Amino acid sequence: MTDQKGMFNNIYKNLVTPILKKDIGIDAEYLTNFSLSLLTFSSKNRNWPLISRIIKSLNQEFCVVDKRLHQKICGIDFCNPVGLAAGFDKNGNAANIWKDFGFGFAEIGTVTKFAQSGNPKPRLFRLAKEQAALNRMGFNNHGAENLVKNLSLIHI
């Protein structure tokens, strides 16, 4: 395999950044769900040869191994202090892929005992000028039992 270091940075810079910086009418929640679906599929099929190569490339590009970044907090070891904030993967569908993006931890977060649909749509808004998003999701998730099932399927 050829050296692909920088490939994902180029994809992000040339494809993702223009979409995020300029509001071209793509619904923010749709874009988020689409991205999470791709990541979930990749996470669940990471042993497929093509997906395995892509994930390996992600890992090589984004993961920094440096013992100076290691953290031990409350007896828990973290390879680095950079984490994925709560709310993106509320149901733990892609929980075993976050480390391949270089995260030292991921906070699943926003999980309730029972499933709930959250606030009515629209509830996620892109603020292109501010390069930000406004989140009024309202704790939509499939519930704690579903999260436990998802995490146990991927041995987390």
Feature annotation, model-predicted:
Residues 63-82, 127:
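N-terminal small/glycine-rich loop or linker at the start of catalytic domains
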Residues 109-151:
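A gly/proline- and charged-residue-enriched helix-loop-helix capping module
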Residues 6-71, 135, 140, 144:
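An N-cap/entry alpha-helix motif that binds or orients negatively charged groups
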Residues 92, 96, 100, 144-152:
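Amphipathic, non-transmembrane alpha-helical secondary structure
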Residues 78, 94-111:
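Active-site cofactor/substrate anionic-group-binding motifs, chiefly glycine-
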Residues 154-156:
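Conserved small/polar residues in nucleotide/adenosyl-binding loops
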Residues 27, 84, 106, 147:
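Conserved, mostly hydrophobic/aromatic
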Residues 80-90:
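Active-site mouth loops of central-metabolism enzymes
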